[in-house]
Design a protein with these regions (language model features):
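A generic local structural motif
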Residues: 49, 68-69
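Enriched for short, Lys/Arg-rich terminal
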Residues: 69-70, 74-104
């Protein structure tokens, strides 16, 4: 049975930042990338544990195949919340200081 899926304001902002950045060089590629990220995330409705366990307790990571992007999310009951979207080359804050990610 599908679960509810929501994007945090931070995740929405990060997706838009990614789209805007790629759009500087190639607007069509930016749209394709954003569409791909959203499509892969939508699979979490049916497979909420599709991603691997993350470094933070309770956080899961979904690698967007064919891109360097990783989606951080958490599952609570019948709800999946997308916390943020990272470029794989970005430096993450050390555990305990990841202010972007909710504590679960």
């Amino acid at each position: 049975m599908p679960v509810d899926l929501t994007w945090s304001p931070l995740a929405r902002a990060r997706l838009e930042e990614i789209r805007a950045y790629v759009s500087l060089d190639n607007p069509a590629a930016a749209e394709r990338l954003a569409t791909r990220i959203v499509a892969v995330v939508e699979a979490l409705r049916d497979y909420p544990y599709l991603g691997r366990a993350g470094a933070e307790p309770g956080i899961r990571e979904l690698v967007i195949g064919g891109t360097p992007h990783i989606v951080h999310y958490h599952v609570r009951g019948k709800r999946v919340t997308i916390n943020t979207v990272w470029h794989g080359a970005q430096r993450k804050e050390p555990p305990g200081r990841a202010r972007d990610l909710p504590r679960v």
